Swiss-Prot record:
Similarity-based family: Belongs to the kynureninase family.
One Gene Ontology cellular component: cytoplasm
Keywords, comma-separated and alphabetical: Hydrolase, Pyridine nucleotide biosynthesis, Pyridoxal phosphate
Annotated protein name in UniProt: Kynureninase
Name of the gene: kynU
Record flagged with keyword Amino-acid biosynthesis: no
Length: 424
């Protein structure tokens, strides 16, 4: 919806929620209560998604099978544990628009980044640089720096960082592509976030991949803030690999299992160096316990150990909702909700805050990052105390995300009312 279609009254927000058929999915989640007992305004799904109401039953089923079957739950449970991760394969493939053989749920995000870099960061004397965002999430920075050091190089000379122009908060697409063209022959790996965690900027993954491949670079994305937020097309965009967590927009719960995408062109490249574990071994001979590792084809060949059933059960509850809603429809609702929140903030015409997230819908997801004058974190603290949940990133950024699965237009309205009151 264009901003001209919005208005600033609460009745408008209530009417929009009533007319929107996608609003029904809100009822599938537990909304934490505010201090006064009403439903909180939960705009922090970019940090931790809400709990689907079916999670408890899904967890209890696995606990019951463990209680009554013991080890036989691997084979005789309602959902046998041996192939349990494959209950999520088709859903994950649909979510990121990939072939089922290209995706797997395993480990956690930073672990998966390391496993992928073992295979796909192969530095040479001439081509040893890794390109990341200067404002990448710290864990990504730590992982990349440690990989560079592990290979005998120095981050001071082998780490390239993308930074905005002076006086700007986000990066211009043309600057990213120009840097890749200029430095590409020295870059071994491009590893960017699909969406920057601090600014909410979404990157043009298709064009970045095309530009990187033209220079001979491996191109990968940390999709922690993109999976379940944007409509991804990882296979079509020809991305080499990607990794993500599932506790943000995917609502898998705190510390939930992560996910990986490896393009099908690597499915049977068994000569690629990789760290190996028994769960990545050919399943037909896994229990023969032989000494030699024979990886499964596709992304499953990068698995190490059997994954946690309880975290996968929680994630399955959410992924079933994603399947029902459809990521395309959710993305359209997200564009409208975030646009409405942006409209309400703009109507304040205040010098006390500034939206630094790109204005173009195609250059952002659900998140808006608001720079608060003088780095006044107390504004965020008071909002949380009142039941308007958001979060703060130093030195001066308040992050809010009207997640389309469970946030409402009225949530956006109530947040802006409280935000302005606290600013004043």
């Amino acid at each position: 919806m264009a901003a001209a279609a919005f208005d600033t009254t609460e009745n408008f927000a209530i009417e929009m929620d009533a007319r929107d058929p996608m609003s029904r999915f809100r009822g599938r989640f537990h909304i934490p209560p505010a201090p006064d007992g009403s439903a909180s305004v939960y705009l922090v799904g970019h940090s931790l998604g809400l709990q689907p109401k079916t999670v408890r039953a899904y967890l209890e089923q696995e606990l019951k099978d463990w209680e009554t079957l013991g080890v036989e739950g691997h084979f005789r449970g309602k959902h046998p544990w041996m192939p349990y991760h494959r209950l999520l394969t088709e859903q994950t493939a649909r979510l990121v628009c990939a072939q089922p053989s290209e995706v797997v749920v395993m480990n956690s995000l930073t672990v998966n980044l390391h496993l992928m870099m073992v295979s796909f960061y192969r530095p040479t004397r001439e081509r040893h640089n890794i390109l990341i965002e200067g404002s990448a999430f710290p864990s990504d920075q730590y992982a990349v720096q440690s990989q560079i050091k592990f290979h005998g190089f120095d981050p001071a000379s082998s780490l390239l960082e993308l930074c905005p122009r002076v006086g700007e908060a986000t990066m211009r697409d043309e600057d990213i592509l120009e840097l890749i063209e200029r430095e590409g022959q020295s870059i071994a790996l491009i590893l960017l976030g699909g969406v920057n965690y601090a600014t909410g900027q979404a990157f043009d993954m298709a064009e970045i991949t095309k530009a990187g491949h033209a220079q001979g670079c491996v191109v990968a994305f940390d999709c922690a803030h993109a999976a379940g937020n944007l409509e991804l097309k990882l296979h079509e965009w020809d991305v080499d690999w990607a990794a993500w967590c599932s506790y943000k927009y995917l609502n898998g719960g705190p510390g939930c299992i992560g996910g990986c995408f490896v393009h099908e062109r690597y499915a049977r490249d068994f000569e690629l160096p990789r760290f190996a574990g028994w769960w990545g071994h050919d399943q037909e001979t896994r229990f023969k316990m032989g000494p030699e590792f024979h990886p499964m084809a596709g992304a499953e060949g990068w698995q190490l150990s059997n994954p946690s059933i309880l975290t996968m059960a929680a994630l399955r509850a959410s992924m079933e909702i994603f399947d029902e809603a459809g990521i395309g429809k959710l993305r359209q609702r997200s564009i409208a909700l975030t646009g409405y929140l942006e409209f309400l903030l703009d109507q304040q015409k205040s010098a006390r805050f500034e939206i630094i997230t790109p204005r173009e819908p195609e250059r952002r997801g659900a998140q808006l990052s608001i720079r608060v004058a003088a780095g006044n974190r107390s504004v965020c603290d008071r909002l949380v105390e009142e039941g308007a949940l958001c979060d703060w990133r130093e030195p001066d950024i308040l992050r809010v995300a009207p997640v389309p699965l469970y946030c409402s237009y009225r949530d956006c309205y109530r947040f802006v009312q409280r935000f302005v009151a606290n600013l004043n």
